[in-house]
């Protein structure tokens, strides 16, 4: 009888332990740019420069950059995930020099970013992969004083 109770206790304990989610599978608290999403958008807007040729012809597009927000909030491993540039008509823009300039500009901005507030799992700071889209859609050069 005593042996059966021990086995029951062990089985219940085992089942309850395996039902606990493992830390690291999902992030309870995503990393945040200091000041929040609005501050991130302003940071990008104030620092992003479109290639002049792209502005002249009215092309627009998007570059998606991924990076890792480390436990201390620093940014590492920035890389371009996807680039889409188009003419106003919707036709794909295929000038590889301009595409490369847009990608380099997006990476430059990521490398300029201040430390983020790190993501947390189970109350502990963790490394988190993050994606940010950079929109290149200005139709005219923007003055630094224009808002």
What label would you give each PLM region?
Residues 2-11, 15, 19-147:
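Charge-biased low-complexity segments
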């Amino acid at each position: 009888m005593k042996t059966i109770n021990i086995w029951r206790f062990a089985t219940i304990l085992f089942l309850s332990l395996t039902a606990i989610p493992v830390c690291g599978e999902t992030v309870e608290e995503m990393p945040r740019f200091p000041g929040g999403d609005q501050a991130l958008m302003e940071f990008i807007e104030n620092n992003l420069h479109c290639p002049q040729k792209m502005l002249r012809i009215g092309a627009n597009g998007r570059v998606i950059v991924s990076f890792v927000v480390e436990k201390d909030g620093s940014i590492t491993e920035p890389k371009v995930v996807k680039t889409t540039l188009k003419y106003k008509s919707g036709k794909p823009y295929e000038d590889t020099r301009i595409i490369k300039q847009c990608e380099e500009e997006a990476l430059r901005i990521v490398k300029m970013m201040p430390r983020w507030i790190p993501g947390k799992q189970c109350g502990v700071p963790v490394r988190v992969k993050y994606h940010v889209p950079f929109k290149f859609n200005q139709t005219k050069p923007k003055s630094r004083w224009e808002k």
